[in-house]
UniProtKB/Swiss-Prot annotation:
Monomer in solution; Homodimer and oligomer in the presence of negatively charged lipids forming a pore with a size ranging between 20 and 30 Angstroms. GO terms for cellular component: extracellular region; membrane; other organism cell membrane. Belongs to the three-finger toxin family. Short-chain subfamily. Type IA cytotoxin sub-subfamily. This is Cytotoxin 6.
Amino acid sequence: LKCHKLVPPFWKTCPEGKNLCYKMYMVATPMLPVKRGCIDVCPKDSALVKYMCCNTNKCN
C-alpha cells in the first residue's frame, strides 16, 4: 500500500501490518491536514480532531 506523506505528491510504501492510509485534521480546519501516512487501525474521532482512513493507494 502506498500512502501520501503530509505534503503530496510525496508518498511512501507502508510497512507490513499497516494497511490503511490516514489523514488527520482539526475539525475547525478540515482543508488543512495535520498528519498523513500509514496506520494499522483507524483512530476514533474526538471533538477537535477527525481522521479519514482508507485502504487504496494514495487515497489520503
